[in-house]
Amino acid sequence: MVHRILAPRRTVHAHCDLPCGVYDPAQARIEAESVKACQEKFQGSDDAEFQARAVSIKEERANMVKEHLWVLWTDYFKPEHLEKHPSLHDLFWSATKEAGAA
């Protein structure tokens, strides 16, 4: 009787152990915009210390772009996404390579 009371009423399937369901490319976009802004500020300054700081922040943000994209790629996308969007693999591969080169 206890098993019947405590048994789940429906079965759900999740991509991870904790089905948070929060996947949004917005954070990757924000970090990419930060990379672009750091590059522009670097170009607009003659201050070596400021430039060094801009490079450090840019590299940190570029790594965050890659991290956010990798989470989407490894945790969110499933084979059916690739079937529906055949260019998805190349898009994510190119995006992470670009972030690494930034």
Name the predicted role of every residue range:
Residues 55, 74-77, 101:
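OB-fold and OB-like single-stranded nucleic-acid-recognition modules
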Residues 3-4, 63, 80:
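A generic short-segment signal for beta-strand/edge and adjacent turn/coil regions
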Residues 39, 66-73, 96:
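Extended amphipathic alpha-helical scaffold segments
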Residues 68-85:
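Short, solvent-exposed, charged loop/turn and helix-capping segments
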Residues 56-59, 82-92:
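Short, well-ordered coil↔helix boundary/capping segments
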